[in-house]
Each structure stands twice: as C-alpha cells, then as structure tokens.
Amino acid sequence: MAENLRFCGPALIADETMLHNVIQMITDIITKQHPCQLEFGPEEETAEAGEETSEFDWVVVDTALDVVSGMAAALGQSFAELWKVFEKTILRYASSGEALERATSVGVLAECINGMGAAVTPFTGTFLKLLLHRLNDEDPQTRSNAAYAVGRLVEHSQSDAEMLKEYPTILSRLEQCLSMNVSRLQDNATGCVSRMILRSREHVPTKEVLPVLVNILPLKNDFEENEPLYRMICQMYKWEDATIRELTPQLLPVFQAVLTGDEDQLEDERRAELIELVKWLNQMQAGAAPWVEQL
C-alpha cells in the first residue's frame, strides 16, 4: 500500500471512509493495539516467545510506518493535519532506547517532512530539537537518517529565524558525520550541507566546508543526494564563488566519474546542467575536459 500511495497519489484514500479506516488501522498498529499484536496465550508462552515476538512486533510496526510516509508523499501539504495523529507515537519511537526503532522513525520523519513541503513550517522547532539530538546518535543509521531529515527541513521550512539560528550547531554535528564512511552517512551529510548552502550560503563557511565535501566525492551510496549536491555546485559557479573555482581541478575528475558512470547517478535536469557547466569550464580552459564533447 505504501508504494501504491507513492506512485499513484491520493486516489487510494480519496474516499473519506477508506481514509478513516486506514488511519485507524495504522494508529492501532504503531501503538501496538492491533489484534495481531496482542498476546492472548498463557504468560509462560508469552515469555517463551521473547525476542522472536518482539522482532515480529517491530516488523508489523515498521510496515505501518512505511504507510505513514507513503501517505505523506501522496497527500503533500495536506498531510500536515494528519501528521498530528501520528506525531506523538513517531517522536516517541525516535527517542527509543532501541537503535532500530530510532533509525526507522527518524527515516519516516524525513519522508514526512519531504511530503509536507512548506506545510512543515509550524513543526520546525519541534523537529529541530529532536533531529539535532539524533545527529549525535551512537547509531550510524539513525545519524544518517537524521542528516537527511535535517536537509529536507532546511529545504522546506519557511521559518528562517528557527533554521538559521541552528546553522552553527547543525554544521558542527555534520562535520563529524562527514568523516564517517558508514551507512550512507557521508552522502546524507553532504546533501544536508548542500541544501544549507543553497538556502543561505552567507551562513555557511564555504571556504572551509567546500574542500571537505570535494574530498569525499563522488558519492558512492545514496545517489538521491547528488541532486542537491550538484545543484549547489552549479549554483556556486553561477555566483562566481572563488572557492569553488579554486577547486575546479579536483572537481573535473568527479564530474567525469558522475557523467560517464551509471546513469542513475543524476536526474535528467541535473545531468544537463552539469554537462553545460563542464562545457563552459572546458571553453574557459581549453582542453581541461575534452571528454565532455563525447556526451
């Protein structure tokens, strides 16, 4: 159902009765009140089930949370009202003592932020407080998902005061993430920094940050983050940024790897923009990137 919601849109839950039933079912599952999650046997049998029962419970909850993120993708900004139904439970999981529960719920939160778009603005303060904490999480996957979620919040929230105030803290915590090559952490941290620069480059020390990003390129795990990354890089050239120009010799091999490698590394629009940039660089310095003429 989650995938159908993402690809087919809100038609699946357009009927009010259907929507109500789905919400009720999902709420029952994520609060562990659905009949399939209740134990009716003797206490001894329940105790013997132990870890196996716990793992089964989480698989069910995880599946329901996936439907929540699917609803966010399908409903867009109108999901903001529905978020209030799920908020308490999802945020509780995001502060769980179990790493898997934290990682999953923070990932769902990221997808909900992306789905809500600008409608996420009223929740900015609440989300930031949680996500800044999770950016220091001991679990790499939770930290990675938090970096992605913060990046999406930077992209969509219209609360400049709340977002820009936390830029120094976010950057400080992302600095550690960028040095950890685990669980897509570098990729999501790179995407987050890129979105921060695109939103307000004046609040990012790009002279120090850009060389760090370039040293870990090209991204190897999460190609979705190539979109904000190369949009940011192209924009920095348009802004005639001195630091990005100085980094051109290091960037050209990265551009070549991305443009001549697997096609799924870039969406068509970003690929076209990057090719245009490389052609311009090749004109400015004849022979700097002769391979671009074959694209």
Label each residue range with its predicted role:
Residues 1-295:
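Karyopherin-beta/Importin-beta family HEAT-repeat alpha-solenoid scaffold
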